[in-house]
Amino acid sequence: MVVLGSTGSIGKNALKIAKKFKVGIEALSCGKNIALINEQIKVFKPKKVAILDSNDLNGLEPLGAKVFVGLEGIDAMIEECVSNLVINAIVGVAGLRASFKSLQTNKKLALANKESLVSAGHLLDISQITPIDSEHFGLWALLQNKALKPKSLIISASGGAFRDTPLELIPIQNAQNALKHPNWSMGSKITIDSASMVNKLFEILETYWLFGASLKIDALIERSSIVHALVEFEDNSIIAHLASADMQLPISYAINPKLASLSASIKPLDLYALSAIKFEPISMERYTLWRYKDLLLENPKLGVVLNASNEVAMEKFLNQEIAFGGLIKTISQALESYAKTPFKLSDLDEVLALDREVRERFGSVARV
């Protein structure tokens, strides 16, 4: 298989599962962590390797693997690969082209890159995509019982780093505090997206594209991250999916569902320790961006605006140019600005053009 973003949290776990399942690695790609990809090359001996920046070529030790550079290089590498499975764990809109290229070359796409569906779900062949996500894996598992007719899909949120922070202190928080996730060990972007609830807005849009626009879609807070998803059926019964907070479960099913179902990749749950499970509504006072959930479901192509504004604000937030309130304000202003715009977005070029436009318009934000 091919692992894009092999040095990140998902990529490292994917390689762990590949080793366990004895799946060969044809190609790897990374952003900046050349030291780690060099280690991965030694262990997995890929035939092809892609890195983002040509300045890193000197430090790369490909050990005979063919080397590709940049986003265009990743596209070319995917095209040359004979593997029928691509794991796309590239962070941000940078992973969008790789998703398109994987599907264009008739590969199955195991998708951890949320931005692909958020920005271009209407252009992707959903039948060839397996989401690498605990919530969507949970929904998929719950929807296997075809005898029951689903009415609404509910995903859970942990509440992120600021779930107990006094409301008046949230706007002045910095990136260091936002990165203290209570339950998961993840990359910096998704951890901050959890604090802002942008991650859950992304997942709501992913649910829309993956499982059908006709169903009611919502989210709630479940602090322990044990309940990942719930489905309410037409008979008013509800079934929940419970599992340890470990991404190896959805990754293993994305790589090989048969082997994943026969051997455990996560710790068993201690049912007697589950007395603390409690569901809470997502407070719009605490998570002000949550008020855009219905707008995004009514006009899901606004996902391009949500993602682009979030990425430019995130960069400034991580660079300590703005506080958390500035990040929220940037995204709010962008969504308000485009709320009534009818989008066509009939191909990838139009999606990327809107993405660039939003970045240019909202790239300079006020310090808050």
Swiss-Prot record:
Matching InterPro entries: DXP_reductoisomerase, DXP_reductoisomerase_C, DXP_reductoisomerase_N, DXPR_C, DXPR_C_sf, NAD(P)-bd_dom_sf
EC number annotated for this UniProt entry: 1.1.1.267
Xref: PANTHER family: 1-DEOXY-D-XYLULOSE 5-PHOSPHATE REDUCTOISOMERASE, 1-DEOXY-D-XYLULOSE 5-PHOSPHATE REDUCTOISOMERASE, CHLOROPLASTIC
Pfam families for this protein: DXP_redisom_C (PF08436), DXP_reductoisom (PF02670), DXPR_C (PF13288)
Family: Belongs to the DXR family.
Cofactor: Mg(2+); Mn(2+)
Keywords: Isoprene biosynthesis, Manganese, Metal-binding, NADP, Oxidoreductase
Species of the source: Helicobacter pylori (strain Shi470)
Binding residues annotated for NADPH, in chain numbering: T7, G8, S9, I10, G31, K32, N33, N113, E115, G187
GO molecular function annotation: 1-deoxy-D-xylulose-5-phosphate reductoisomerase activity; manganese ion binding; NADPH binding
Positions bound to Mn(2+): D133, E135, E203
Pathway involvement of the protein, from the record: Isoprenoid biosynthesis; isopentenyl diphosphate biosynthesis via DXP pathway; isopentenyl diphosphate from 1-deoxy-D-xylulose 5-phosphate: step 1/6
Presence of keyword Manganese: yes
Protein name: 1-deoxy-D-xylulose 5-phosphate reductoisomerase
Enzyme class of the recorded protein, top EC level: oxidoreductase
NCBIfam families noted in UniProt: Dxr (TIGR00243)
Function: Catalyzes the NADPH-dependent rearrangement and reduction of 1-deoxy-D-xylulose-5-phosphate (DXP) to 2-C-methyl-D-erythritol 4-phosphate (MEP).
UniProt-annotated binding residues for 1-deoxy-D-xylulose 5-phosphate: K114, S134, E135, S158, H181, S194, N199, K200, E203
Tagged with keyword Oxidoreductase: yes
One record GO biological process: isopentenyl diphosphate biosynthetic process, methylerythritol 4-phosphate pathway involved in terpenoid biosynthetic process
Catalytic activity: 2-C-methyl-D-erythritol 4-phosphate + NADP(+) = 1-deoxy-D-xylulose 5-phosphate + NADPH + H(+)
